[in-house]
């Protein structure tokens, strides 16, 4: 901190001659602070006023806001969350950004390095273009912060759509090479990428589908996806058995797919997985030997999935707006099923149907899934006719 460094430091209380009050809720909200930030150096009337009231000019403002989102994510009670709504910090950011003609604003730790680079390049002087860039970044921080607070209070009401992401990832391209692609969000909160090339737009679509699918299963399960649909899936006592039976469902379509499991991948499983070409593999962890085997191909994307909760809402852009719905977390149980045929299914058949239902729920309609013994045998997906989907599934099962 500055106080522990050799740099001269003055407490806010010394500047304002007023103590921090209300348990720290009011510290910087004072004319001697905001006057020094907002005064226009080129306006004689402003300069006369700050001289009259002995307000020092403030040329650089650095703010680290209270961690509101992190506090919400921690599951804290509302009183603790409320205390993490920053008042003075946001006000400092907005004031300094508004007066970017004369003031540099550093509104988050992400801007420390650009600011340091600027200082190393040409010292303590800044250009209007540089100050305007920092102001833009600052308003991005403040708008994101306010959106997070609104979304917390709005809860499940959905009274308005507010979506904000501080981190932007430029992708190699969009769905096709001629399209630009970006990802807004924090992938690092969900995955550690420990090997491989940069994740693409299409990779992200498959990864999203894979996560939604694997979360349906509690037993040790392995799934293989292509174009957002499962082409292989099995639940077995071990990850090796789950992999072998998932691959057996459609070994042709598995080529170049995205692989996901909810179990730790060991050496035995890695040796078998390594025999095919795939784009991405996702697991909660890997044995050291397994990583050494899977990392032999430099472009393979190897992800460790973190225990991060998925949003409760799903969004889809279309026309000139956005569709929002609750994430489908419904899980059917045998007790909810109604027999409408003369012949009633056996307990094993009901188990197979509920297993298949988890897969078809995460397949592109119209879709038919054939499964038995906790294994995907074949599927017909993305058909305009359910009859055609069934024909496709039967043909693939032969």
Question: Where in this protein do the model-derived segments appear?
Answer:
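Short beta->alpha connector loops at strand-helix junctions that form conserved
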Residues: 11-18, 107, 283-285, 304-306
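Acidic/Gly/His-enriched mid-domain segments of enzyme catalytic cores or analogous surface patches
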Residues: 8-79, 87
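Short, small-residue-biased leader/transition segments that mark boundaries at the very start
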Residues: 1-4
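Short, charged, surface-exposed secondary-structure boundary motifs
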Residues: 18-26, 114-118, 290-294, 311-317
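ATP-dependent carboxylate/acyl-activation modules
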Residues: 60-63, 144-147, 153-398
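Non-catalytic interaction/clamp surfaces of large macromolecular machines
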Residues: 110, 114-162, 276
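A short, charged helix-loop
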Residues: 60-83, 87-126, 180, 185-191, ...
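Short, well-ordered, mixed-charge alpha-helical segments that flank or form enzyme active sites
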Residues: 46, 69-72, 92-95, 102, ...
């Amino acid at each position: 901190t500055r106080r522990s460094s050799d740099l001269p430091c003055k407490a806010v209380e010394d500047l304002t001659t007023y103590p921090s009050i209300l348990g720290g809720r009011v510290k910087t909200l004072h004319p001697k602070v905001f006057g020094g930030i907002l005064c226009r150096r080129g306006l004689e009337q402003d300069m006369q006023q700050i001289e009259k009231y002995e307000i020092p000019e403030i040329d650089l403002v650095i703010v680290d806001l209270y961690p509101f989102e992190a506090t919400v994510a921690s599951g804290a009670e509302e009183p603790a969350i409320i205390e993490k709504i920053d008042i003075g910090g946001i006000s400092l950011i907005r004031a300094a950004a508004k007066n970017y003609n004369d003031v540099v604003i550093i509104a988050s730790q992400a801007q420390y390095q650009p600011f340091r680079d600027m200082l190393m390049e040409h010292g303590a002087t800044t250009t209007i273009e540089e100050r305007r860039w920092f102001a833009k970044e600052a308003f991005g921080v403040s708008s994101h912060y306010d959106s997070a607070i609104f979304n917390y209070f709005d809860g499940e009401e959905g009274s308005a759509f507010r979506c904000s992401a501080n981190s932007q990832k430029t992708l190699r391209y969009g769905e096709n090479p001629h399209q630009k692609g970006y990802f807004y969000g924090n992938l690092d909160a969900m995955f550690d990428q420990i090997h491989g090339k940069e994740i693409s737009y299409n990779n992200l679509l498959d990864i999203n589908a894979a996560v939604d699918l694997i979360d349906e299963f509690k037993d040790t399960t392995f799934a293989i996806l292509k174009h957002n649909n499962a082409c292989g899936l099995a639940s077995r006592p071990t990850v090796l058995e789950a992999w072998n039976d998932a691959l057996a469902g459609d070994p042709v379509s598995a080529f170049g797919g995205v692989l996901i499991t909810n179990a730790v991948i060991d050496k035995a499983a890695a040796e078998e997985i390594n025999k095919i070409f795939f784009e991405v593999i996702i697991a909660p962890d890997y044995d050291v030997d397994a990583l050494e085997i899977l990392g032999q191909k430099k472009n393979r994307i190897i992800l460790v999935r973190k225990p991060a909760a998925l949003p409760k809402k799903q969004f889809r852009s279309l026309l000139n707006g956005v569709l929002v719905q609750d994430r489908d977390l419904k899980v059917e149980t045998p007790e909810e099923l109604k027999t409408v045929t003369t012949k009633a299914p056996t307990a094993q058949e009901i188990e197979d149907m509920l297993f298949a239902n988890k897969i078809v729920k995460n397949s592109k309609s119209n879709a038919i899934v054939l499964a038995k013994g906790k294994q995907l045998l074949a599927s017909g997906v993305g058909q305009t006719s359910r009859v055609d989907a069934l024909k496709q599934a039967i043909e693939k099962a032969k």
